[in-house]
């Protein structure tokens, strides 16, 4: 990504971890430094991506959408997002703040769905061609607490309706991925909002200092 002038910052975590709040905080911190930003979400962020999101998230497709189809839909949406939104923004110097990216697929499909990680990595290499975030923040939350918080938002979507064991597998896989990729910043999201935001602010301010 050295040829691109902007930066891609990704916020990761389970349902209820506070990703949307974190995205808003990062945007605010960057705006204070006069850095132009855009936000994205996965799956979605483009016209095609939002259509695919409506399929992936729709509870009507419980026990209908094959895991392999789900995986391919996610990568189709990600390719569109990268090529239509993220790269053009980075090329003009904007910083992109993304609610989920590649790590989610490894955790949810690889961990939660128990899909073959080698296959996912091969598909990732083919689709992304080495494209990676400049910074990833993983908001670590206990799955039970996360689902309590998520439930307060309203009716569960297709993914949120999965069993608690599903989310424990995702949580465990996130931890493995963080250990394998020390550049990922893990933040304890079980704490109060003020404490979580303070940790995020420290990471972002240090990142800005080294990238301006």
Swiss-Prot record:
Pfam families: Thymidylate_kin
EC numbers, comma separated: 2.7.4.9
Keyword Lipid metabolism: no
Positions contributing to ATP binding: 13-20
GO biological process: dTDP biosynthetic process; dTTP biosynthetic process; dUDP biosynthetic process
GO molecular function, one term: ATP binding
Reaction equation(s) it catalyzes: dTMP + ATP = dTDP + ADP
InterPro entries documented for this protein: P-loop_NTPase, Thymidylate_kin-like_dom, Thymidylate_kinase
UniProt enzyme class: transferase
Signal peptide: none
Keyword line: ATP-binding, Kinase, Nucleotide biosynthesis, Nucleotide-binding, Transferase
Assigned GO CC terms: cytosol
Record-stated family: Belongs to the thymidylate kinase family.
Function: Phosphorylation of dTMP to form dTDP in both de novo and salvage pathways of dTTP synthesis.
UniProt name for this protein: Thymidylate kinase
Native source species: Legionella pneumophila (strain Paris)
Gene: tmk
């Amino acid at each position: 990504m050295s040829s691109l002038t902007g930066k891609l910052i990704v916020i990761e975590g389970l349902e209820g971890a506070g990703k949307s709040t974190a995205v808003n905080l990062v945007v605010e911190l960057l705006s204070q430094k006069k850095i132009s930003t855009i936000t994205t979400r996965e799956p979605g962020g483009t016209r095609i991506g939002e259509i695919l999101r409506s399929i992936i998230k729709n509870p009507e497709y419980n026990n209908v959408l094959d895991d392999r189809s789900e995986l391919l839909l996610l990568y189709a949406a990600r390719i569109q997002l990268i090529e239509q939104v993220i790269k053009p923004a980075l090329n003009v110097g904007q910083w992109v703040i993304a609610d989920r990216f590649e790590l989610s697929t490894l955790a949810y499909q690889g961990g939660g769905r128990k899909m073959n990680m080698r296959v996912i990595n091969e598909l990732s290499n083919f689709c992304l061609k080495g494209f990676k975030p400049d910074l990833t923040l993983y908001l670590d939350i206990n799955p039970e607490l996360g689902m309590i918080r998520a439930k307060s938002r309203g009716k569960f979507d297709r993914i949120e309706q999965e069993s608690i064991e599903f989310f424990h597998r995702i949580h465990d896989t996130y931890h493995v991925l963080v250990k394998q990729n020390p550049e990922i910043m893990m933040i304890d999201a079980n704490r109060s909002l003020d404490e979580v935001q303070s940790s995020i602010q420290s990471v972002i301010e240090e990142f800005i200092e080294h990238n301006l």
